[in-house]
Amino acid sequence: MALKRIQKELMDLQRDPPAQCSAGPVGEDLFHWQATIMGPNDSPFQGGVFFLTIHFPTDYPFKPPKVAFTTKIYHPNINSNGSICLDILRSQWSPALTVSKVLLSICSLLCDPNPDDPLVPEIAHTYKADREKYNRLAREWTQKYAM
């Protein structure tokens, strides 16, 4: 079941990739993918290229894939291990969701962080208290790690 679904998603992604994103298997293992997200233009991550890993569980799509950034990023909902705080990767997962939709949700999280549900409270505080400083640091990290 999982393999068929993953193969179908791969075909759909190759046929109609989401804007600013790409993804596909690492080598022959269809349960382990690498994804790329281009920093959205309306964000301090503009110009950056961010790499993520995607690991599908054997009971996919009934359980969400594990998605993590491998590129360092300054963001209140993404920690230094690359873990992403995003409801659809946890409690709000649904088998109707796809990798494509997950990547688009991560893109919109880059543009619109959720400082009220942070993985990195210090960054969330900076985002809320001093948006200019947040944007500056996010741009600096993007230039340092994602370009």
UniProtKB/Swiss-Prot annotation:
PROSITE patterns: UBC_1, UBC_2. It catalyses: S-ubiquitinyl-[E1 ubiquitin-activating enzyme]-L-cysteine + [E2 ubiquitin-conjugating enzyme]-L-cysteine = [E1 ubiquitin-activating enzyme]-L-cysteine + S-ubiquitinyl-[E2 ubiquitin-conjugating enzyme]-L-cysteine. Disulfide bonds: none annotated. SUPFAM superfamilies: UBC-like. Pathway: Protein modification; protein ubiquitination. Belongs to the ubiquitin-conjugating enzyme family. This is Ubiquitin-conjugating enzyme E2 D4. It comes from Xenopus laevis.
